């Protein structure tokens, strides 16, 4: 599969006085249709990298290519047409008086004909299960519902890539499950390229690939099973382990033999059930 994002020797600083770079010689490629999770502690460079990919920040050196376009000041608006971003606080993205008006806003800016806009608003509200709230004011929605509306607004302009920048961090557990499930569906069924920037290790474990950033550098890049099976790396940089791995560590401390390979929650439950039957 071809790479939809190519980043070479990317360097960025917020000021010349910084002792270290916010992004320091980052190199990576992301394939079309992948769900990639970017993880790292606060200040590791995750959100800065996302903003560079979208052209909200311009790197001081290196190059970014998105869907065959080299990102420059001349091409930035063409690049942004290929990318949708969903931020941590959806209130900062709302501009419409009601839900359907907010979803339509991005299309209005692109000059999409009214009949086509109405068609897309209906389609994307159905896709995120928010049709019943079309006439509601966004401020009166729950956190999870607000994020669904923000996602609908992104879907309406039909990008190829969706970046979720800490989009679940302010949600309750139910809202978080809903949005992560929607990410999965958009990736599996609609083939969107998903980039999820998150502190939630359990969310990251559901991605196709996990990239670990620390102090502006990529320090690991692999499938979730291999990243989380080597838990020492994560704990050294201040990250938690996914729940199944944390449970395995507790069982080890009690002298119980556990599998070496990474287990997701379903795999952990299966292993516990088999172990109980043997005993």
How does the language model describe each region?
Residues 39-41:
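The feature captures the beta-strand-to-loop junction immediately N-terminal to the Walker
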Residues 62-70, 79:
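Conserved ABC transporter NBD signature motif
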Residues 137-141, 145:
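Conserved ABC ATPase signature
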Residues 162-165:
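Catalytic Walker B motif of ABC-type/P-loop ATPase nucleotide-binding domains
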Residues 54:
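Helix-to-loop junction immediately C-terminal to a conserved catalytic motif
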Residues 115-133:
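Conserved ABC ATPase "signature" region
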């Amino acid at each position: 599969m071809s790479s939809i994002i190519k980043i070479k020797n990317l360097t960025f600083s917020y000021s010349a006085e910084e002792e270290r770079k916010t992004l320091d010689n980052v190199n990576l490629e992301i394939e079309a249709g992948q769900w990639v999770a970017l993880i790292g502690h606060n200040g590791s460079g995750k959100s800065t990298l996302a903003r560079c990919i979208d052209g909200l920040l311009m790197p001081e050196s290196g190059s970014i290519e998105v869907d065959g376009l080299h990102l420059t000041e001349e091409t930035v608006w063409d690049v942004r047409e290929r990318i949708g971003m969903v931020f941590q606080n959806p209130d900062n993205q709302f501009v419409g008086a009601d839900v359907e008006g907010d979803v339509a806003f991005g299309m209005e800016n692109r000059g999409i004909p009214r009949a086509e806009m109405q068609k897309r608003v209906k389609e994307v509200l159905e896709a995120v299960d928010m049709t019943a709230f079309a006439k509601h004011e966004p401020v009166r929605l729950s956190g999870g519902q607000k994020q669904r509306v923000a996602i609908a607004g992104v879907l309406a302009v039909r990008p190829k890539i969706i970046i979720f920048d800490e989009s679940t961090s302010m949600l309750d557990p139910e809202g978080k499950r809903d949005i992560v499930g929607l990410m999965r569906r958009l990736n599996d069924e609609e083939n969107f390229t998903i980039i999820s920037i998150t502190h939630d290790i359990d969310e990251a474990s559901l991605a196709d690939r996990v990239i670990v950033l620390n102090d502006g550098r990529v320090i690991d890049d692999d499938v979730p099973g291999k990243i989380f099976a080597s838990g020492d790396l994560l704990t050294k940089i201040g990250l938690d382990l996914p729940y199944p791995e944390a449970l395995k560590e507790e069982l080890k401390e009690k002298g119980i033999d556990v599998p070496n390979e990474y287990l997701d929650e379903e795999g952990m439950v299966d292993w516990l059930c088999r172990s109980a039957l043997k005993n």
